[in-house]
Amino acid sequence: MGRKVHPIGFRLGYIKDWQSKWFAEGEEYTRQLHEDIELRKLISKELQSAGVSRIEIERSANKIEISVYTAKPGIVIGKRGTNVDTLKSALERKTGKKIKLNIKEIHQPELDAQLVAESIGEQITRRVSYKRAMKQAVQRAMRLGAQGVKVRCSGRLGGAEMSRVHEEAEGRVPRHTLRADIDYAQVHAHTTYGRIGVKVWIYKGEVFPNQVAKSPAEPATTAPTPAPERRERQPRRNSNASA
């Protein structure tokens, strides 16, 4: 089952959270859903070179809070905040509501599946060897602490006559385990030979949502188990002895 479904959608509500957090009913739900899609398209288009990983949207009555996770916050903010102010104004004109924009930095882009997939796709578009781009991405992620990485490219790789699939993997990626923290992304690279699909799985370890971590300052203490009493050995009865 883990091979057939989206790795993040498979874990929603268990160890993963939703990227849109609001509640609505009927036609209002449809309207807000389409509005979220348009907002994400606008932000991704305006911040195409800023390395945006994901966009989280939270709604209240007359306010929308948007959190943008990026590897290059300086490009998003701009000189003296001009870029972020321009983007905020464009979003407010589109929605007619007050927008609160939060810019959050990703400190290790090599461990973010979306950014890794976009990097590989960009290199393939620039005619870099797809094998080299995939292998370097896997090695960088493993060097920074990933427990497993898998990269798959499919299409007319290297301008081949027939499309094929090529994979690079290192470590383990347990896609069936719900508590496994797996980051996943899928992008498309547009080349002169057609479109190349890039998929990335990054396994970062296991997460136990119900486990309570104990404070190191207060280690758990248990009462010592008493040693079992030693019994005296009874003398062996001689069966040959006469009564």
Curated annotation (Swiss-Prot):
Q: Could you tell me one molecular function GO term of this UniProt entry?
A: mRNA binding
By its UniProt entry, which InterPro entries does this protein fall under? KH_dom, KH_dom-like_a/b, KH_dom_type_2, KH_sf_prok-type, Ribosomal_S3_C_sf, Ribosomal_uS3_bac-typ, Ribosomal_uS3_C, Ribosomal_uS3_CS
Keywords attached to this entry: Ribonucleoprotein, Ribosomal protein, RNA-binding, rRNA-binding
- Locate the coiled-coil region(s) and give their ranges: none
Q: Which domain of life is it from?
A: Bacteria
Q: Which GO terms describe its biological process?
A: translation
* Region of interest: Disordered: 212-243
Q: Name one GO cellular component term.
A: cytosolic small ribosomal subunit
Q: Which family does it belong to?
A: Belongs to the universal ribosomal protein uS3 family.
Q: Which NCBIfam families match?
A: rpsC_bact
| Chain's role | Binds the lower part of the 30S subunit head. Binds mRNA in the 70S ribosome, positioning it for translation.
Subunit comment: Part of the 30S ribosomal subunit. Forms a tight complex with proteins S10 and S14.
PANTHER family xrefs: 30S/40S RIBOSOMAL PROTEIN S3, SMALL RIBOSOMAL SUBUNIT PROTEIN US3C
Report the protein name in the record: Small ribosomal subunit protein uS3
Origin organism of this chain?
A: Chloroflexus aurantiacus (strain ATCC 29366 / DSM 635 / J-10-fl)
